[in-house]
Amino acid sequence: MFEVGGKCLAYHGPLLYEAKILRRWNPKLEKVEYSVPLKSGEEDGLPESMNREEFYYYIHYQGWKSSWDEWVSVDRIMELTEANIELKKQLVMEAKKASLAQQQKTKNGGSAKRGGGGAHSESNHGGRRSGSGDRRDSNAEERGIVPSEGPFRTSSVMSYNFSRNKLRIHIPMILESMLVDDWEIVTKEKKISNLPNPFPVETILDRFYKDVATRTTSPVELSLVEEYVYGLKQYFNEAIGNLLLYKLERLQYEQVFYPTPEQQQAMTPVERSLSGRRPGQLYGVLHLLRLISILPEMLSNCVGMDTQAINVILRHTEKLLLWLVDRIEDLLPHKVHKSYYTNTSSQYEGVALGL
């Protein structure tokens, strides 16, 4: 039994993350136990489908936004022990190895090519969310991770469910591991993105549209893709300042897009060349992946967007993710991965982090 207010490790996708237990459903007492009392008008948010004869835990992932807080069953969490911390590190290393192996296959025209199996036809690598190993239990289906039937069971790489207004996108492991690396490089190594990126978001999305256009004969489908690409560009440019940057990166963003007169005078020629450009013309594929990772939450909060429109967005996001897997070696080759970033000075860190 895990204590309310205590720390643990929790599976989110194939990896383990440190988390804090905020609430606990106690089946013996038949009530929710809290570490902090609920605010006025706040509900406990117990899932209707949960088995009330078992313990459930409402957790907050350390360093994540509170919007990712969720109820999980006991098979999703582990004690915060040295042995389990080592397991956490091992899973990260395995994800990195899988990423490199997949990149090599993609480069050699192997199983990652479209229609050739590999990452596109793997069993759901997010199965950890429903317990351990590859087990797909009924609880996973109830949460919409592995729909058992219906029109939303579109692929093994990602699945989504509108039944409880909870949308999910499962990012292929090769891309997910890159997001893990990205997080570590920015938050641990204190590096920020080199701007402009040689393959900025808008260029990537334009290439995606052109590739789809060469294979699509339906004018209606092509129009939908064009609208999707346009909308995603707008989402990116609007969201990056508030939602997509780590704390260390925000100062750079402010200096580029909202410089003070003093900062403008001190700009280098390269920094001046960034003036007037949109974020989508400067940031690269990893920041696009950050957007995709929170896209379900953004769509869930869009008032007035109907199910059909959301379904179209998710369907094209699935196509975009698979397209990125096929071309990630071109967009972010391993040998130049580190050049995506630049070191920060102690002065920059002090201002950016408020030290």
From Swiss-Prot:
Keyword RNA-binding recorded: no
UniProtKB keywords: Chromatin regulator, DNA damage, DNA repair, Nucleus, Transcription, Transcription regulation
Biased composition, class Basic and acidic residues, residue ranges: 131-144
Gene from which this protein is expressed: EAF3
Descriptive protein name: Chromatin modification-related protein EAF3
UniProt record, GO biological process: DNA repair; DNA replication-dependent chromatin assembly; negative regulation of antisense RNA transcription; nucleosome disassembly; positive regulation of transcription elongation by RNA polymerase II; regulation of DNA-templated DNA replication initiation; regulation of RNA stability; transcription elongation by RNA polymerase II
Domain Tudor-knot: 3-77
MF-aspect GO terms: histone reader activity; methylated histone binding
Subunit structure, interactors included: Component of the NuA4 histone acetyltransferase complex.
